[in-house]
Regions:
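A generic structural motif
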Residues: 14, 124-135, 180-189
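Active-site phosphate/pyrophosphate-binding segments
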Residues: 56-150, 232-234
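Short, small/acidic-rich helices and loops at N termini and domain boundaries
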Residues: 216-234
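Hydrophobic/aromatic beta-strand patches that form the interior of the parallel beta-sheet core
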Residues: 12-14, 30-32, 100-102, 127, ...
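A short acidic, often aromatic-flanked loop/helix-cap motif at beta-alpha or helix-coil junctions
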Residues: 38-42, 134-136, 187-193
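C-terminal active-site/capping subdomain that shapes the small-molecule cofactor and substrate pocket
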Residues: 140, 145-222
Length: 234
């Protein structure tokens, strides 16, 4: 924000409070205040919808995106029961295992989101990669059996056909050398619908995993400890 002020940029703030809200009021910036008291990772709906609204107001987001948002909400309501069943199945398979997330190219951002949710909410290690990138290096690592690994592919209808074929060629290798392979096929017509469909599954899987472990999905004491130690260094 300070850099934006220095460049005399037009600033709109989306914040749950704190220093950002204080500065917005101090400089008379437009701001949208969202509910506080929750970690940012739990407020994706609030932050994303308001971000789209702000971008739309400045002509930086297509009007069709608002319709896609409505369709995304409808899809998640419609698929709610099916998603709940799938979430439990995935979480039970992942319990006491390490997730290996593979995006087939289109939704790497979703893979990052799910990895981070499993890291923070489930307090578990997890890694992600993409096709075809993993074919150039990581694929060579699949040479020995590791029953601690569960491969999860994130697939959308927007993935390239050749990339899908690459995955299908590699899948038997994953099945041979891991505990299990789970293919998550996104539902919906637009990228937004399909991305949020997968995000919804990933978010809840991470919370269910925390419940299976009997831990609090919200606390991040180890990060708080790191910040405290860094603060001592000045």
């Amino acid at each position: 924000m300070e850099q934006g002020i220095g460049k005399k940029a037009q600033i709109v703030c989306i914040t749950s409070g704190g220093k950002v809200l204080e500065m917005a009021k101090q400089h008379s910036f437009q701001f949208i205040e969202i509910p506080g008291g929750k970690p940012p990772r739990a407020c994706l709906g609030y932050s994303f919808v308001h971000l789209v609204k702000v971008l739309g107001a400045y002509g930086l987001a297509p009007s069709s995106l608002f319709k896609e948002l409505d369709n995304t909400i409808d899809l998640l309501y419609k698929e709610n029961l099916n998603i709940k069943k799938l979430e439990v199945e995935v979480a039970k398979t992942l319990h006491k295992k390490i997730a290996v997330l593979y995006s087939l190219g289109t939704c790497e951002g979703v893979a990052v989101r799910i990895r981070q949710q499993i890291n923070e909410n489930s307090k578990m290690l997890c890694w992600h990669n993409t096709f075809p990138e993993m074919n150039h290096n990581e694929l060579v690592g699949w040479t020995t059996k590791n029953d601690d690994l569960v491969v999860i592919s994130l697939q959308t209808t927007f993935d390239y056909e050749r990339t899908k074929k690459r995955y299908e060629v590699c899948k038997p290798l994953f099945e041979k050398y891991s505990h299990a392979v789970i293919d998550l096929h996104a539902k919906g017509n637009s990228k937004l619908e399909q991305f949020f469909y997968l995000i919804n599954i990933g978010d809840w899987v991470s919370v269910i995993l925390a419940d299976l472990k009997g831990i609090d999905p919200v606390e991040v004491k180890i990060i708080d400890h790191l910040k405290g130690e860094l603060a001592k260094m000045g």
